């Protein structure tokens, strides 16, 4: 997702570019942003916290899944790739945080590489969430093992998600460069010549469609039918499974839908499809800062939603601790018995 707040300005008197669109002589207007400094430091602290939490949580998820070589499920393969996507996404946050202080000082090459890495892992994460919803839909609604549920096919699906993510992200790698507007600090920005605003609209609409809207519709469709099936079926602990599924969709919506809506409003304003004013630019700039924080938070919430709630993850983590003598094997055995008697049909245990 094109991060409209990546190119942050310094402590200049005027806000030239806080929504990521360097001003031109035609559309420049001296809009002041009263909360610039406050927003800057709030975002830096948030990036640091998300980076640390995501690094810890997703590393643990990868450790547990890779440690469990026998009995690794289809969902585990998706979760492993999702953890990799979130972890790689989080690794770009320190660089973006540093750019909040003095602008983009890292040059064009790093601008391209870090932007590509950030975009690829954002989109791969969302596409993998959609794949998990399809996997749960097939397992619960159709209760059958289709080709997509075979391990080699799942690996192909994951590779396809990464490949599509690279394709969606290529424009940012090709067109982004270090850019130094007049009377302002340098930014990492897509430079497309005289038609920059028009092409930026295209660069936003295509990823919005294929990297957000379509995966979201797939998730809503699959989880909708999955919940309907669980309501009709007489399955033990089905309410627990429903809580996990609700968390999947609701957390995703809470984290990314607000940012995408505000980003759409910013694009419409910058292309003059809605009226532009200093007040509106300030409002959208503050909204982008706030909603971007929610979106970035999603990368460290995934381990909680998809792993820490699940019985299998907790048992796998305790098994690693027991192997290294950090917990007793008796405690591990008691936990395994409790997990087995309280879990339902793979619906919630995998999640």
Swiss-Prot record:
Cellular component per GO, a single term: external side of plasma membrane
Keywords carried by this UniProt record: Cell membrane, Chemotaxis, Disulfide bond, G-protein coupled receptor, Glycoprotein, Membrane, Receptor, Transducer, Transmembrane, Transmembrane helix
Database matches in CDD domains: 7tmA_CXCR1_2
SUPFAM superfamilies assigned: Family A G protein-coupled receptor-like
Keyword Disulfide bond: yes
Transmembrane segments: 47-67, 77-97, 113-133, 155-175, 205-225, 244-264, 290-310
Pfam families in UniProt: 7tm_1
Segments on the Extracellular side according to the record's topology features: 1-46, 98-112, 176-204, 265-289
GO biological process: calcium-mediated signaling; immune response; neutrophil chemotaxis; positive regulation of cytosolic calcium ion concentration; receptor internalization
Family matches, as PROSITE patterns: G_PROTEIN_RECEP_F1_1, G_PROTEIN_RECEP_F1_2
Residues with glycosylation annotation: 3, 17, 182, 194
Function, as annotated: Receptor to interleukin-8, which is a powerful neutrophils chemotactic factor. Binding of IL-8 to the receptor causes activation of neutrophils. This response is mediated via a G-protein that activates a phosphatidylinositol-calcium second messenger system.
Family (UniProt): Belongs to the G-protein coupled receptor 1 family.
Oligomer and partners: Interacts with IL8. Interacts with GNAI2.
Family annotation (PANTHER family): C-X-C CHEMOKINE RECEPTOR TYPE 1, CELL ADHESION MOLECULE
Protein name (record): C-X-C chemokine receptor type 1
Organism name: Macaca mulatta (Rhesus macaque)
Gene name in the database record: CXCR1
